[in-house]
Amino acid sequence: MFILPPPQEPLLGAHTSAAGGLHNALYEGRDIGATTVQLFTANQRQWKRRALTQEMVDQFRIALNETSLSYIMSHAGYLNNPGAPNPEILEKTRVCMHQEIADCISLGISFVNFHPGAALSDSKESCLDRAITSFSQMAPLFENHPPLVVLLETTAGQGSLIGSSFEELAYLIQGIKALIPIGVCLDTCHIFAAGYDISSVAGWEQVLKHFDAVIGLSFLRAIHLNDSVFALGKNKDRHAPIGEGCIGSDSFCFLMQDERTRMLPKYLETPGGPDLWTKEIRYLQKVC
């Protein structure tokens, strides 16, 4: 199995808009001073995906070359529930997962990021096992060793969502890692909401030590940079601009500097759009 190596330089970007064409997300990234971006490759709130045409692939790959952006991340749709107890939703999810991964391979995207799932009326244990089956069924797509890694995003712990604890993510990874390239995308707002105190350097030291012990730092492949509107452990997923929430700017400067996290691709999902992202990228690159 081919495992995508880490980048050779720090990469920083944001979730940019693919309005008017997937390639436009790359050009918006270039315009805000990014070196990588995250995007939706299809409407994130619909089951039906538009078919990827050769023209779309060509436009995207030309934009990749022209912008010199790398380690692009696709964020899978919000309707997906890899651990859904409802058989119809589970089957729809698996079809979408297959299409999403296939499109990412065609486009030359490096990461495809999924929310692990929600148990809803069922137990989390059963949800975790169904999610493992869902991701395992994607193995045939990786037979030709594409340079793509599937990422499980940390969640805030609201409702019946799985993936808010490192232990749950470790369980998923242990069940998947032999079949597909798998890793974790750590969302700073989400883990803070789930009770991991990253508001200080000392806090980060404890969290990274715990992550390494439970999952292994080699599985940490990317970071979503978001401050948090709500306080520690509230299980509420509300992003704030960098330095304007309950986590604080020192936490993000730590991520930019520490040898364990400095080279991990980082993607802003903060509210405010391109004007704010330009300022945040400049701040994180120059001030931190």
Curated annotation (Swiss-Prot):
<protein>
    <recommendedName>
        <fullName>Probable endonuclease 4</fullName>
        <ecNumber>3.1.21.2</ecNumber>
    </recommendedName>
</protein>
<keyword id="KW-0862">Zinc</keyword>
<dbReference type="GO" id="GO:0006284">
    <property type="term" value="P:base-excision repair"/>
</dbReference>
<feature type="binding site">
    <location>
        <position position="115"/>
    </location>
    <ligand>
        <name>Zn(2+) 1</name>
    </ligand>
</feature>
<dbReference type="InterPro" id="IPR013022">
    <property type="entry name" value="Xyl_isomerase-like_TIM-brl"/>
</dbReference>
<dbReference type="InterPro" id="IPR001719">
    <property type="entry name" value="AP_endonuc_2"/>
</dbReference>
<dbReference type="GO" id="GO:0008833">
    <property type="term" value="F:deoxyribonuclease IV (phage-T4-induced) activity"/>
</dbReference>
<keyword id="KW-0255">Endonuclease</keyword>
<feature type="binding site">
    <location>
        <position position="153"/>
    </location>
    <ligand>
        <name>Zn(2+) 2</name>
    </ligand>
</feature>
<feature type="binding site">
    <location>
        <position position="187"/>
    </location>
    <ligand>
        <name>Zn(2+) 2</name>
    </ligand>
</feature>
<feature type="binding site">
    <location>
        <position position="153"/>
    </location>
    <ligand>
        <name>Zn(2+) 1</name>
    </ligand>
</feature>
<keyword id="KW-0234">DNA repair</keyword>
<feature type="binding site">
    <location>
        <position position="190"/>
    </location>
    <ligand>
        <name>Zn(2+) 3</name>
    </ligand>
</feature>
<dbReference type="GO" id="GO:0003677">
    <property type="term" value="F:DNA binding"/>
</dbReference>
<feature type="binding site">
    <location>
        <position position="269"/>
    </location>
    <ligand>
        <name>Zn(2+) 2</name>
    </ligand>
</feature>
<dbReference type="GO" id="GO:0008270">
    <property type="term" value="F:zinc ion binding"/>
</dbReference>
<keyword id="KW-0479">Metal-binding</keyword>
<dbReference type="Pfam" id="PF01261">
    <property type="entry name" value="AP_endonuc_2"/>
</dbReference>
<keyword id="KW-0227">DNA damage</keyword>
<dbReference type="GO" id="GO:0008081">
    <property type="term" value="F:phosphoric diester hydrolase activity"/>
</dbReference>
<keyword id="KW-0378">Hydrolase</keyword>
<comment type="function">
    <text>Endonuclease IV plays a role in DNA repair. It cleaves phosphodiester bonds at apurinic or apyrimidinic (AP) sites, generating a 3'-hydroxyl group and a 5'-terminal sugar phosphate.</text>
</comment>
<feature type="binding site">
    <location>
        <position position="239"/>
    </location>
    <ligand>
        <name>Zn(2+) 3</name>
    </ligand>
</feature>
<dbReference type="InterPro" id="IPR036237">
    <property type="entry name" value="Xyl_isomerase-like_sf"/>
</dbReference>
<dbReference type="InterPro" id="IPR018246">
    <property type="entry name" value="AP_endonuc_F2_Zn_BS"/>
</dbReference>
<feature type="binding site">
    <location>
        <position position="237"/>
    </location>
    <ligand>
        <name>Zn(2+) 3</name>
    </ligand>
</feature>
<keyword id="KW-0540">Nuclease</keyword>
<comment type="similarity">
    <text>Belongs to the AP endonuclease 2 family.</text>
</comment>
<feature type="binding site">
    <location>
        <position position="75"/>
    </location>
    <ligand>
        <name>Zn(2+) 1</name>
    </ligand>
</feature>
<dbReference type="GO" id="GO:0003906">
    <property type="term" value="F:DNA-(apurinic or apyrimidinic site) endonuclease activity"/>
</dbReference>
<feature type="binding site">
    <location>
        <position position="224"/>
    </location>
    <ligand>
        <name>Zn(2+) 2</name>
    </ligand>
</feature>
